[in-house]
Amino acid sequence: SSAASDVYKRQVLGKAYNPLYGWYVSSKHALEGWSDVLRLEVKQFGIDVVIIEPGMIKTNIGNYSAQYFEKYSKNSEYKNFYGSPDDSNENTFDDYSDPIVIAKVIDKAINAKNPKTRYSAGAYSWILLTMRGILPDKWFDRLIVNVTG
């Protein structure tokens, strides 16, 4: 059992990505690299660094972002990525996981005697990470573009 654990929520978007979320995805890539290095640096002190990889979780970030996408992209070449103003956003989160799913995984990681390096949980996390790992980049790009816009 380690003396302590540092747990970081990274989001699947650190490995998978969506158009118009470059600002968010880049921060998750940075957290991924930093966590990997930190894990090596603090292991000697008995500290485990654990990364939580949430899938699609019911939060307000999508609605919040959509306001800005529409405002700043509606007359640009990028408008096809956020949809038309008539597109309904009501059912977007129906199949997303509740945040409690991630809280339970964090609890599991903190209380594990020998925690895994990474835990994934939530809607689409497993499938996105698996697809990202097995598909060539251009195929995955095409999949993302077909799904998002």
Across the structure, where does each feature detected by a protein language model lie?
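Short, small-residue-biased leader/transition segments that mark boundaries at the very start
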Residues: S1-Y8
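Active-site segment of SDR-like NAD(P)-dependent oxidoreductases
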Residues: R10-A16, G55-M56
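Active-site-adjacent segment of SDR/Rossmann-fold oxidoreductases
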Residues: A16, V37-I47
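Active-site helix of classical SDR
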Residues: S27-A30
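Core catalytic loop region at the nicotinamide-binding pocket of NAD(P)H-dependent oxidoreductases
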Residues: V49, D87-G133
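Non-catalytic terminal and boundary segments that flank Rossmann-like NAD(P)-dependent oxidoreductase
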Residues: K138-G149
